[in-house]
């Protein structure tokens, strides 16, 4: 539905066809699928060796078993003792085997309205995604997340879960307060800062 000028100049409801997807997502995924990295077993490489350019990331990852990869990405739930207390989840180097490879444990916290801790730690509360979208103020949003980044660093938090980029009024969504707007253009711009 959109506004259309009538013969007398007043606006009336009008309609236009909704755009249809022109990309086949399954085809695109198949075309961009990476080749599997063959398993080599432990060659003695550490994650720091990738940073020092002694080995490639592919050579490093080739040492990890399927179980290692599953443990790294499955992670642990709320309030893991291996990371900052009260955070939403831990992931990465949570097992002794992964730690031997030099992979650190990392954590994330819920963040649609700032950092959240479940242990009594105080944190700055930010406007949720919808309110940020209502400002149309990119420099303001950038300043807010600059501050959130500092707070994350101070509290040893590696990732912030939110705000979200789903579009309001999409039938697949479920957490509208986290989303920035029903306008995909505005959502993209606010998210990019």
Region locations from a protein language model:
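Glycoside hydrolase catalytic-domain context in secreted enzymes
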Residues: 1-193
């Amino acid at each position: 539905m959109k506004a259309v000028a009538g013969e007398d100049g007043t606006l009336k409801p009008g309609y236009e066809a909704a755009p249809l997807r022109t990309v086949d997502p399954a085809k695109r995924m198949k075309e961009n699928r990476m080749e599997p990295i063959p398993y080599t077993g432990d060659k003695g490489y550490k994650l720091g060796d990738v940073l020092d350019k002694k080995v490639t990331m592919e050579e490093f990852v080739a040492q990890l078993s399927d179980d290692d990869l599953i443990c790294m990405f499955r992670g642990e739930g709320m309030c893991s003792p291996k990371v900052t207390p009260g955070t939403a989840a831990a992931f990465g180097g949570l097992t002794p085997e992964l730690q031997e490879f030099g992979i650190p444990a990392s954590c994330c916290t819920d963040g649609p309205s700032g950092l959240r801790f479940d242990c009594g730690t105080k944190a700055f509360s930010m406007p949720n995604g919808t309110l940020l979208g209502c400002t149309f103020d990119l420099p303001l949003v950038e300043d807010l997340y600059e501050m959130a980044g500092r707070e994350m660093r101070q509290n040893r938090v590696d990732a912030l879960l939110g705000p979200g980029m789903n579009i309001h009024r999409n039938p697949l969504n479920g957490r509208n307060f986290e989303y920035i707007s029903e306008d995909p253009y505005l959502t993209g711009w606010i998210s990019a800062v």
